[in-house]
Swiss-Prot record:
The gene is lgt. It comes from Geobacillus thermodenitrificans (strain NG80-2). It holds the Pfam family LGT. Catalyzes the transfer of the diacylglyceryl group from phosphatidylglycerol to the sulfhydryl group of the N-terminal cysteine of a prolipoprotein, the first step in the formation of mature lipoproteins. The lineage of its organism: Bacteria, Bacillati, Bacillota, Bacilli, Bacillales. This is Phosphatidylglycerol--prolipoprotein diacylglyceryl transferase. The chain crosses the membrane at residues 19-39, 56-76, 94-114, 206-226, 237-257. One of its GO terms (cellular component) is plasma membrane.
Length: 270
């Protein structure tokens, strides 16, 4: 039995003459602004100047976007080498979170050095904002009908008690697909709540950020295995899964070494 015609949600948020504003950018921008608001509130509570994270974001966000796009293009070079004009078109999607994180962390490290601020203190304050921003940002993938998993039936999606507007948006090219964007968004939302709880536990400085890295990477490894559009390092070897395992190992090693060497004496609340 053929499905009735299902139209996807309009990707365009606003059209101003020749200027097109897409939902993808609006949603990612919303995630950044909410994250900035949360980080600014917490930074003031932790005794930092109110403008600290505003200044950091002015550098970190553009660099993170460039790195996220460069990372994606690098692993899709067979395509982009023949379509160079499409490389700047980030509104079509194609921002790799791992690339963005590398850019953001590197920027944060330089920023902390220049401002004379403790890097791990900044990282801990930023961690809940980052994962909440990721939870929000995945809905940009939803609007673009990307970052989905393998084929499923409509009945499968209905059994997840999803509203029709989500189910219909997962109908792409005559087939329903796993809403992996939603799985990751929910995973990150749980991670956000977990980090807020861990903040009250008063871990040693840096360990809240490392907890974020471990939590996000565990979820990303699991969910990436369902996706159909993964960046591939080699045949049957998904780059995001390799990065997730690598980041988990690095985070655990840093956690243990910093404690063993006495490099993590200060607490989050200090």
């Amino acid at each position: 039995m053929m499905e009735p015609a299902i139209e996807p949600l309009d990707r365009v948020f606003l059209q101003l003459g020749p200027i097109t504003i897409y939902w993808y950018g609006v949603i990612i921008g919303t995630g950044v602004l909410i994250g900035l608001w949360l980080a600014t509130r917490e930074s003031v509570r932790r005794g930092l100047p109110k403008e600290t994270f505003v200044d950091l974001v002015l550098f970190a966000v553009p660099i993170a976007i460039v790195c996220a796009r460069a990372y994606y293009v690098l692993f899709e070079w067979d395509y982009y080498s023949k379509h160079l004009a499409e490389i700047p078109k980030i509104w079509q999607g194609g921002l790799a979170i791992h690339g963005g994180l590398i850019g953001a962390v590197a920027t944060g490290a330089v920023f902390a050095q220049v401002r004379g601020l403790p890097f791990w203190k900044l990282a801990d304050i930023a961690a809940p904002s980052i994962i909440l921003g990721q939870a929000i940002g995945r809905w940009g993938n939803f609007m673009n009908q990307e970052a989905h998993g393998g084929p499923v039936s409509r009945e499968f999606l209905e059994n997840l008690y999803l509203p029709d507007w989500i189910i219909n948006q997962m109908y792409i090219n005559g087939q329903y697909w796993h809403p992996t964007f939603l799985y990751e968004s929910l995973w990150n939302l749980v991670g956000f709540c977990l980090l807020l709880w861990l903040r009250r536990v008063n871990l040693r400085r840096g360990e809240l950020f490392l907890s974020y890295v471990i939590w996000y990477s565990l979820g990303r490894f699991w969910i990436e295995g369902m996706r159909t559009d993964s960046l591939m390092l080699a045949e049957h070897l998904r780059m995001a899964q390799v990065m997730s395992i690598t980041l988990i190992i690095i985070a655990l090693v840093l956690w243990m070494v910093r404690r063993a060497k006495g490099w993590a004496r200060e607490r989050y609340m200090d």
